[in-house]
UniProtKB/Swiss-Prot annotation:
This is GTPase Obg. Gene3D superfamilies: GTP1/OBG domain (2.70.210.12), P-loop containing nucleotide triphosphate hydrolases (3.40.50.300). One of its GO terms (biological process) is ribosome biogenesis. Belongs to the TRAFAC class OBG-HflX-like GTPase superfamily. OBG GTPase family. GTP binds at residues 167-174, 192-196, 214-217, 284-287, 313-315. It holds the Pfam family MMR_HSR1. Monomer. GO terms for cellular component: cytoplasm. NCBIfam families: Obg_CgtA, PRK12296.1, PRK12297.1, PRK12299.1, small_GTP. Transmembrane segments: none annotated. The gene is obg. Residues 161-332 form the OBG-type G domain. It comes from Aquifex aeolicus (strain VF5).
């Protein structure tokens, strides 16, 4: 399995424009022909192209410098130098491109095949034929080609998913993802099994499909860089809503309501916009709950707060079909609301 890398810094440079030529016509019966130096070719651009066949920025960890081809110099007989070839770099769909110096977002590549020029090639210099005037019919100079643009840029990958699974480590998100989809994330009964986001596709039928992302477990102070969560919070930003998974197997270890509120605090501290994302609550591990009456109390609490509540066991499959329908219903509700706002 390829290593997941979601943030890199690379250097890009457009090709230099070719120099203009200094040349004169030399024909049999015109020993003193006019200026005939052609223009230099344009330098190649550096272009990023989004592709769904890539899922990580790992390649850029090993190669940091990307320079497009230079334009060729102009030639005699007013012949134009060949343009430098553009350098095409493929990046995963969902890549945000920023200027490393200013932090300005250059482009956000969210669609298959979307392109972004990150460094333009320099213009070719004009040949001496361009500088002929009535008073100077034989200019002996031409223009140099311009340098290509160069800069350091930051590539940040934000996964594109419809639903983000969030919750503390060990809430059972990976097992839930494998139940809902065909994804096969690492699953073990200890915190931080998931070291990178996992994506899976939930198919209710051929028309109803949702992409679900399992975001590695957050802990308190994740927004400050504690644990693993801070590295992956950006992946939640593109989701339409969150499925907040809480572990109800052992109320003594971490009270579910406290766990829910602690995670929401982290989202709020990282980005107030994130905390406002719609959420549903998924109470997981009900198979290990000895007193099921506690579930009714939890459901009452969350419904009073305005959250939809689903009780499931990712391990046994109990409640999973109801959750699938609930996820789709929530997705449709948000999608319809967004469509209404656009029109």
């Amino acid at each position: 399995m390829e290593k997941f890398v979601d943030r890199v810094k690379i250097f890009v440079k457009g090709g230099k424009g070719g120099d203009g030529a200094v040349a004169f016509l030399r024909e049999k019966y015109r020993p003193k022909g006019g200026p005939a130096g052609g223009d230099g070719g344009k330098g190649g651009d550096v272009i990023l192209v989004a592709t769904s066949s890539k899922h990580t920025l790992l390649d850029f960890k090993y190669k940091k410098h990307y320079i497009a081809q230079n334009g060729e110099p102009g030639k005699g007989k007013k012949m134009h130098g060949k343009d430098g070839e553009d350098l095409i770099i493929y990046v995963p769909v969902g890549t945000v491109v920023k200027d490393a110096q200013t932090g300005e977002v250059i482009c956000d590549l969210v669609k298959e095949g979307q392109k972004c020029i990150v460094a333009k090639g320099g213009k070719g210099g004009r040949g001496n034929a361009r500088f002929a005037t009535p008073t100077n019919q034989a200019p002996t100079y031409a223009e140099k080609g311009q340098k290509g643009e160069e800069r350091w840029i930051i590539l940040e990958l934000k996964l594109i998913a419809d639903v983000g699974l969030v919750g503390f480590p060990n809430a059972g998100k990976s097992t839930l993802l494998s139940r809902l989809t065909r994804a096969k994330p690492k699953i073990a009964d200890y915190p931080f099994t998931t070291l990178s986001p996992n994506l899976g596709v939930m198919e209710l039928d051929w028309e109803r499909r949702l992409v679900i992302a399992d975001i590695p477990g957050l802990i308190e102070d994740a927004h400050k860089g504690a644990g693993l969560g801070h590295e992956f919070l950006r992946h939640i930003e593109r989701t339409k809503f969150l499925a907040h998974v809480i572990d109800v197997s052992d109320f003594r270890e971490r009270e579910p309501v406290q766990a829910f509120e602690a995670i929401n605090r982290e989202l709020e501290l990282y980005s107030p916009k994130l905390a406002q994302k719609p959420q549903i609550v998924v109470a997981n591990k009900i198979d290990a709950l000895s007193d099921r009456s506690l579930l009714s109390e939890l459901e009452k609490y969350f419904k009073e707060k305005g959250y939809e509540f689903y009780a499931v066991s990712a391990l046994t499959g109990e409640g999973i079909e109801e959750l699938k329908e609930g996820l789709w219903k929530k997705y449709e509700e948000i999608r319809d609301k967004e469509s209404a706002q656009v029109t």
